[in-house]
Amino acid sequence: ASCRTPKDCADPCRKETGCPYGKCMNRKCKCNRC
């Protein structure tokens, strides 16, 4: 998922890992694991 802020990653990361947290690196979400 593309992003500008870590908040942009909440929904895509929740879908991907079940965890609504991630970093935004090079405009791409890098999702954390819970």
From Swiss-Prot:
The signal sequence is none
Q: Where is this site: Important for activity?
A: Y21, M25, N26, R33
A Pfam match is: Toxin_2
Q: Which domain of life is it from?
A: Eukaryota
Expressed, tissue-wise, as follows:
Expressed by the venom gland.
Modification type Cysteine amide: residues? C34
Keyword Disulfide bond assigned:
yes
Q: Where in the cell is it found?
A: Secreted
Keywords from UniProt, A to Z, are: Amidation, Calcium-activated potassium channel impairing toxin, Disulfide bond, Ion channel impairing toxin, Neurotoxin, Pharmaceutical, Potassium channel impairing toxin, Secreted, Toxin, Voltage-gated potassium channel impairing toxin
- Note the site residues: Critical for activity (is inserted in the pore, pointing downward): K23
Effect caused by changing R14A: Increase in selectivity for Kv1.3/KCNA3 over Kv1.1/KCNA1 (>2000-fold more selective). Very weak decrease in inhibition of Kv1.3/KCNA3 and important decrease in inhibition of Kv1.1/KCNA1
This protein's record includes keyword Transferase: no
**What happens to this protein after translation, modification-wise?**
Amidated. The amidated toxin shows 5-fold more affinity for Kv1.3/KCNA3 than the synthetic carboxylated form.
Free-text note regarding domains: Has the structural arrangement of an alpha-helix connected to a beta-sheet by disulfide bonds (CSalpha/beta).
Q: What else is known?
A: Negative results: does not block Kv1.2/KCNA2 potassium channels. Does not induce hemolysis.
Q: What does this protein do?
A: Potently blocks voltage-gated potassium channels Kv1.1/KCNA1 (IC(50)=7-11 nM) and Kv1.3/KCNA3 (IC(50)=11-29 pM). Also mildly blocks intermediate (IK) conductance calcium-activated potassium channels (KCa3.1/KCNN4) and ERG1/Kv11.1/KCNH2. Shows ability to suppress proliferation of lymphocytes, which are known to be sensitive to Kv1.3/KCNA3 homotetrameric channel block.
What does the sequence similarity comment in the record state about its family? Answer: Belongs to the short scorpion toxin superfamily. Potassium channel inhibitor family. Alpha-KTx 06 subfamily.
* Protein name as catalogued: Potassium channel toxin alpha-KTx 6.3
Q: Specify the species.
A: Heterometrus spinifer
- Lineage of origin: Eukaryota, Metazoa, Ecdysozoa, Arthropoda, Chelicerata
